[in-house]
A protein has these predicted regions:
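Canonical tetratricopeptide repeat
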Residues: 64, 98, 132, 166, ...
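Alpha-helical segment of the N-proximal tetratricopeptide repeat
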Residues: 19-60, 64-71, 92-94, 98-107, ...
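Helix-start (N-cap) detector for alpha-helical repeat units in TPR-like alpha-solenoids
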Residues: 26, 59-60, 93-94, 109, ...
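TPR/TPR-like alpha-solenoid repeats
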Residues: 68, 102, 136, 170, ...
Length: 291
């Protein structure tokens, strides 16, 4: 209609013109915001998204805004945006898990549990929700409840490898090495090889007193990823306990190279005497479960 009016010289509708202009501005702001996010200009992206939302409500733009906030470390703001989206789409489990993930990053486990409870009201048999609920329980050091939630998640989805890994890590922390070994065995057989699974396996073997096997697994991790600080650190502890002072010192030197802040109290060059003393000190303070 506006086209024909302009073509034949008729009157235009100011409201329609404003609506069309707002729509164009919204699209431009959304496009500029997405483009800015892709090149890491998150502050500008936030300005674009917030301005676009002043024009009209849009779930996609609000989701983009939450992601930009996360990139900037503004987790409170990100969570607020995601919670607004969950109100708009109360049955959207994925959005609730996004919000729970941000709460987890904030270490706000009460908020995380509240979100998971809302998600379970929508789908009580969602394995991923039970996994997130377990993470919140474990964050509060409720190990028994966390194990129960993880077991529930695995019962609902036996292929949920993240739940088995977390359960294995928690069982190790609780000293139940045999049960932890069962989770590692399943992961080794059914899941793709990963550093986390191998590290868990090595830690279990070390806790059982199988130092040689643990060292072998740590060495395999290092072969896969020569920058795996935990593997060097924990292998070095075992080498020290076995009397392999040279091997332990070599591992500690690698730890210091890869993570200079690890031993911020080391002064001067790494003399033979100094590195030995610091190595013994570091390994004596090391948690045997890598926790």
């Amino acid at each position: 209609m506006g086209f024909w009016n302009s073509l034949f010289g008729g009157e235009t509708n100011p409201e329609e013109e404003k609506r069309a202009a707002d729509e164009r501005n919204f699209d431009l702001l959304k496009y500029d915001g997405v483009k800015a996010m892709r090149i890491g200009q998150y502050e500008y992206a936030v300005k674009c998204f917030e301005k676009a939302l002043e024009t009209k409500e849009d779930a996609e733009v609000r989701d983009y805004l939450s992601r930009a906030f996360i990139r900037m470390g503004r987790l409170d703001d990100a969570l607020a945006e995601l919670k607004m989206l969950t109100v708009q789409e109360p049955d959207n489990i994925h959005l609730k898990m996004q919000a729970a993930g941000v709460a987890y990053m904030k270490e706000d486990y009460e908020e995380m549990i509240a979100i998971c409870e809302q998600a379970l009201d929508v789908d009580a048999d969602n394995a991923m929700v039970h996994l997130f609920y377990a993470k919140a329980e474990l964050g509060q050091e409720n190990l028994i409840q966390g194990i129960a939630r993880l077991t529930k998640a695995i019962a609902l989805d036996e292929n949920l490898a993240d739940a088995r890994l977390l359960r294995g890590q928690t069982l190790l922390k609780m000293g139940d090495f045999n049960a932890a070994t069962e989770d590692v065995a399943w992961l080794t057989e059914h899941a793709e090889e990963s550093e986390d699974v191998l590290l868990l396996h090595a830690r279990i073997e070390a806790a059982k007193g199988n130092a040689d096997e643990a060292i072998r697994i740590y060495s395999h991790v290092i072969d896969i990823n020569p920058f795996q600080v935990d593997a060097f650190r924990e292998r070095g502890k075992l080498r020290m306990e076995q009397g392999d002072k040279q091997g332990a010192e070599e591992d500690m030197k690698m730890v210091l190279e890869l993570n200079p802040e690890e031993m911020a109290d080391v002064n001067g060059e790494y003399s033979a005497e100094g590195i030995e003393q610091k190595t013994r000190q570091a390994y004596s303070n090391l948690n045997p479960f890598g926790i």
